[in-house]
UniProtKB/Swiss-Prot annotation:
GO terms for biological process: DNA replication; viral DNA genome replication. It is an enzyme of class 2 (transferase). Replicates viral genomic DNA. SUPFAM superfamilies: PHP domain-like (SSF89550). PANTHER family: DNA POLYMERASE III SUBUNIT ALPHA. GO terms for molecular function: 3'-5' exonuclease activity; DNA binding; DNA-directed DNA polymerase activity. It catalyses: DNA(n) + a 2'-deoxyribonucleoside 5'-triphosphate = DNA(n+1) + diphosphate. Its EC number is 2.7.7.7. Belongs to the DNA polymerase type-C family. It comes from Bacillus phage SPbeta (Bacillus phage SPBc2). This is DNA-directed DNA polymerase.
Amino acid sequence: MIGCHCHTDRSNIRLLDSTNSVKELLKTAVKMEYKGLAITDHEVLSAHLDAIRTVREMKKKGDMPEDFKLILGNEAYLVDSLEEVRDNYKSGVTKFPHFLMLAMDPKGHEQLRILSSQAWENSFYTGTMERVPTVKKDVEELLSKDPGHIIATTACLGSEVNIHLLKIKAFEETGDSQSIKQHKLKIHEFITWCIEVFGKDKFFIELQPALSEEQIYCNKKLIDIANGYDLQMIVTTDAHYLRPEDRAIHQAFLNAKDGEREVDSFYEACFVQNVDEIHERMDYIDKEVIDQAIKNTMLIGEMIEDYTIEHEPIIPKMELPNFKLRHLFKPAYDQYEYIKKMSESADEQDRYLLKLIEDGFEEKLKTSELTREAFHKILNRINVELGELWEISQKLNQSMSSYYITVREIINIIWDDECGGDSLVGAARGSAAGYLVNYLLDNTQINPMQYDLPHWRHIHKSRPDLPDIDIDTEGSKRQKILKALRERFGDKRVLQIATFGTEGSKSALQTACRGLGIDNDISQYLSGMIPFERGSNWPLKHCFYGDKETGRKPIKEFIREVEQYPNLKETALKIEGLTNKRSSHAAGVIIFNDEYTKSNAMMKTPKGAYITQFNMGDSEAMGSVKFDLLTIEALDKIRVTLDQLIENNEIEWQGSLKETYNKYIHPDVIEYEDDKLWEMAGNGEIMDLFQFSTEVGHQSVVKVKPKNLLEAAVTNSLMRLMSDGEEQPVDTYVKYKNNLNKWYEEMTRYGLSEKEIRVMERHLKDIYGVADTQEVVMQMVMDKDIANFDIKESNYLRKSIAKKKEDVLKEVEELFFKKGKEIGTSDNLLNYVWNVQFKRQFGYSFSLLHTLAYSIIALQELNLNYRYNPLYWNTACLTVNSGGIDTEDTKDNKKTAATNYGKVASAIGNIRQRGIKIDLPDINKADFGFRTDINNNSILFGLKGMNGIGDDVIHHIVLNRPYSDFNDFIERMFKSGIIKKGQVIQLIKGGCFDSFGNRQEIMKAFISLISEPKSKLTLSNLKMLIENNIVPSEFAQEVRFFRFKDYISKKVYKTLKSPKDKLFLLDDVSASFYNQHFSEDSVVDMLNGQLVISEKAFKKEYDNKMSNIKSWITTEEPLKKLNDCLLIKEWEKYADGSLGKWEMDSLSYYYNDHELSGVNFAKYDIADFYKLPAEPVKGKPYQWRGKTLYEYETTRIIGTVLDRDKNKHAITLLTPTGVVTVKQWSGSFSHYNKQISRSIGGGKKEVIEKSWYTRGTLLMFTGFRRGNNFIPKVYKDSIYNHTVCRIDFVDNEGSMSLTTKRAEI
């Protein structure tokens, strides 16, 4: 049997559907003794290449029979008319029938790609459901041109034929013969259409072995249809999970998206069933019929070719302009073989590349100033690089030149500020920086010969691969760049690359919790305990079982917490790694020579962006060549700075963006040497310095205090390396930089001879004896005095040491020592090189070409701060961090990035520490983003940086300016409905109206406006008066009567219609009060000894008793008191707290005093973090596992939470003296970070206590300082009992009201 209808987790990209990975599905098929399997995901082909590779690997390992047949298909949604289902959609009525198509050969697969791309082109939403219909007419037109390449089947209960059969079933029960006749006609039309389009021998009726009443009915009718039209039948299981034991996990996975979804019965039979299970489930049908249907699946297999959709890479070719090669290098042609070959090449792409090289040579290298020696050195480098291109082109049988020409064209489009991307382009990224040809073409901006960068890291004939030139751009211009590329090359030739999101460890645990009905607060708490290391969370397997290779131990606390919830562990482990969504790759773009369906297929992201159906690796394997257009915020910040400088006449616009950039900050024109420039870096003065803005980066650049570009690049590399010992590589570098003799002492300790030390000097002296990059490692092993590796071997070593896999490392280590000993290298030198210099890069290794290029971008930022007032740069950083720049700058579509409030708040805190003033946002002056005020040496806060305002409101505020006073603003903006109450309050809190008067008085005026005071009172307002303690004591009895009436009104026994009345049943307590204060006139009955009274009769007596208080209520006194109370409540709701609290709520920083500046620091032993020793002070010793350790002296700090990093378990705290990072261990962080709620029924819950790490929370931490971090810690015998306390209130004496424990339910 062949499973002709099976789903993988790629079916999950629109709606959670399947828990089958490709590999496990195929393994299960083999286990169930299938002879083949079809991949038929829901309108997506993405799993096909993965399946091809998996089958190949399994056959190679002997895990799958050689004759196992893989079939590639698609389950489409086949409709009669797009307009009908889209424009006339009716929920529950409009159907999108399922339909199965299987490709018989490569042509059939191309047809699937075309149809699937058309379906995605047709896509639209009905509510939150994304529809991707395939129109019958499109199928007809396509297959009529070249029929016979696709097999079709009727699919599942959701198919057109089964939809009509189930309608017939319903009408049979009601006896509606006319409707039955109509649906039979529809079935006939559908069947005959399928026969006409696909052919009778390529269209099959599909039966399925589900036990539902509907499936049994349809199966019987489908047999009749097959016999009536002389069609073949097949049996499929529509596998969405692997085996019955996976059913509960599949149910939990699907329910995680929609808890109300009924999935268990619907998918009851949707697993990989063996033949016996199929027979057992279909025992109501003749065995011979089922046997033949099973046999027919093999018939389908015989009709399908064995083929692959893989293809050699197809390099895009640009249409070239008319050009003439000037033969600038002709006098040296005979000396430089490959320059001559390119000049005489039959391929015009080669000749055009050489023409561009000639242009760049004259423009960039100032040929008139070159000596003969320098001239030939450059020509030799060009010749070597062209030689690599030429030889690889011969091996690939296509011109590599076209790749470089295409990259140049893309970069020109990106630079174009008139009809292109209007974006800066980064100096270089990665290995492309090592190629002189790239520099001459303007593909990079760095002359590699100036820095002795090796060309062979980019491409080399020993590894005939395509080059990979990554391009950095402004993040805010990405959509504009993509639009410009589509306009240049055509919509059908440009696609962004797809990426498929998977269930990581955190999301898998959270998904499992949702599916199993475990509260979200618990889910967040548990997932917060998963460690985060080197940019990613631990896999769940490592959390539960540990991992020997990485040295990770099981997390006992995590295991203990998870195991409290049945099936959570098993479900989460199974879900982890499953595909759950689609999106566009952050960088990858493919430019096709032909329409994309020739080698790929198109789909859309949920936001409508056009992307490939295959991920990057698969797309490349199918022949596509990708171009990585990456985005870095540094370029956005540089661009905003340049725009400000132009606006303030500090620099002049040069007619284009590129020419302006070239004049002022191109790497060829910036300052490299000035000591003051490097002091700014070493002192940590530059905000968000590229590559050094993280905590580690900032610490490293301050430690190293680089004096030149090379030292900055080394710092950039070494700060990423980690040592097993206490001294980290960057610390070793600093030590040797300050005293190079210590490096020589190290080499002497390892027994190196004078000659061997000279060898080390050759490679390491310029970088103070610390091998920092891949290139240094490769050059050392290629040294004839060390190991004499060739390029291929050194490249293998580079890749191997970066993986930190014991078996791979051992293999390359043996090769290194073997080759070294063969050429006579001493054990001492080999040991020193391997165990000291190389060891630092085990597990992680960085490239010099990348760090140097990126350090140049940092240097450009330094230049902007050095040459111009740093206010411009600081303002640009705040603007970009706040999302205050357009992310899509097209005529019809303006968007802005989300504000990173925590990052903005931290940056403002750090800026103010350096004495820079941040002015409050003035309603008539503040821009969308932050703005430099050079005259006042300050930065004006940008409206985008405010909490709770919103882009649209900001645009309206700016559009309607100026405002003459606060009332003018209210009349035109608030009363007109443009701006909401909460947004006005945020503007007031943030000081936007301070120019109009006192902030608190303006707030009072607005609160008075919105508090809606009562104009008069009646007895119906008595409850409100009582709640606010306004009723005088003289009316105490009336208050009791009111509460009595309120109480019995909830005890309705019976409602009478005629005469209209309600009867109240009094309990013992209320009956006693009634008998004491009211007459029997209202009593109408007794029920089991309890009084029953009439509401109508009671009300007369009640109103009479309430007459005095009723008169009082209508007087001025209670009205004034109640309105005063309402005003106070509105104030407490919206405007409680100090000005500092207002500013934190609105701006996330304190313009005035910190909320905690009045705390009695001495009373609570609170320290200024910045005056604490940088390293913890040792205190009392103690023994732990045979070692002597020390307690550290602890103290306290206080501050306001600005931000939290759930991965790094860190809190950004604004203390009264500056911003501090507090770092906790995962369990403690999760404990204080979790939200605590309780169920209140009806699927709802109320929050008992928010996370303590919510922005704006005031906290006190106990612990010690380590470097730039504060580490919470208390000891058993310490005077402090808690690492974290929440500060609830500070009184006038500086005493704090503290909460020391989390709330309990």
